[in-house]
């Protein structure tokens, strides 16, 4: 599992950015387009049972990008993330969501509830890699609205060491790539900053901007000694 050295000081339960989700209509086409335009090579992920979605993983070391597509419209419509992916595709948004990683989701949940946050139940998930390895996790949604949100969800991985998606072997055009910043837009930027302060503390890994709609606006990566922006 990637370390938590990027976690802000003072957070009782460390959290860091884990991954960013990019909605695509077709996984193969989306992966080819990402590689052609940005030089980032994706690897097969797997289907999310009961969620109606499947993914391709773009490893970034401590983090990763997740190309996510709807493979069963009925199942996807029953899940909050599936609905957001469908909405993002309809609106032609390049980014749909982002996630934070923690080692103790129950502690994070208790801290947020103690601050008065009304949270839905924790959800367990899994997928099977092409090699048969099963990856399991638990997630905590924060924003329960149906549309893409600027607020990330939180994930706790329940996997053996070395199996985090970001740690997979990558063959990007310019060598290893790393996520440097997630830029989100919010109609109520002050409220969004306050929430992210509770979730992530003071961190250079995110930036909040005033916007007409809520959501992830762009991400900044570094590869081959150069900055790479996806927006």
Predicted regions mapped to residue ranges:
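A residue-level signal for conserved active-site and pocket-lining positions in enzyme catalytic cores
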Residues: 98, 155, 196
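Glycine/small-residue-rich interface belts in oligomeric ring/scaffold proteins
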Residues: 29-85
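Vicinal oxygen chelate
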Residues: 4, 9, 16-26, 54-57, 61, 66, 80-177, ...
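Hydrophobic, proline/glycine-rich low-complexity stretches
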Residues: 2-4, 9-29, 36-40
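Amphipathic alpha-helical segments
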Residues: 27-41, 108-115, 188-200
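Aromatic-anchored, glycine/proline-accented short structural segments
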Residues: 172, 181-211
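Structured loops at beta-to-helix junctions and adjacent beta-edge loops in soluble globular domains
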Residues: 61, 70, 101, 155-158
